[in-house]
Amino acid sequence: MFSALPAYAGLTSITAGYDFTDYSGDHGNRNLAYAELVAKVENATLLFNLSQGRRDYETEHFNATRGQGAVWYKWNNWLTTRTGIAFADNTPVFARQDFRQDINLALLPKTLFTTGYRYTKYYDDVEVDVWQGGVSLYTGPVITSYRYTHYDSSDAGGSYSNMISVRLNDPRGTGYTQLWLSRGTGAYTYDWTPETRYGSMKSVSLQRIQPLTEQLNLGLTAGKVWYDTPTDDYNGLQLAAHLTWKF
């Protein structure tokens, strides 16, 4: 596998992880295991990820495999881009197709502006166009970020979300703790009404990256999301863990 990388490429990390989400009521659960490689090639950083997932409902079960890759490229001191693409089996586990293009602009000291576009095709040929913009502020060991995202779904129309995150770096070492808070809307269509109905969504997630040795990091994540739809209210509890070996 590694021989496929160019001679001037340097493998920087390998990650293996597991992610479990349990939904309330009859919404089932989702299991995800993945392996990930990150390599550095001159001004580019390359990511390769292979995931295996399972989505269980009360009476139905789906399995799927997803492959994805991303390239971060530093054009100069103030412009960095990220291009990502992913493909998966046609099931409710993952999006079938996923393409994203992000642009990061360091136009002010200790400030990073971000904008981007994302196209996703889901199970049953539902397509979603996503536009997002945000800003990150770097103040000592704290990184504070805000992002606004607009979604345009082929079957339900528009919705949006607002996300705030705060990351606190450890005084020494590479460990950190990060909190995400988000709130937004959801658009839904039903056979029994010609009108698009709207609901809401909110979530909270906390992650700890803990160095175990100079090369090995442990990541632990816990989160919860609440869905308020026109026909049902439910929530999902997420627990995730990963190990990263750095070269």
Where are these regions (language model features)?
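Short hairpin/turn module used for nucleic-acid contact or packing/dimerization
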Residues: 237-247
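Short N-terminal segments immediately surrounding and downstream of signal-peptide cleavage
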Residues: 9-23
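Cleavable N-terminal export/targeting peptides
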Residues: 1-13, 42-45, 78, 247
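Outer-membrane beta-barrel translocator/channel fold
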Residues: 19-34, 49-70, 84-102, 106-239
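Transmembrane beta-barrel wall of Gram-negative outer-membrane proteins
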Residues: 70-82
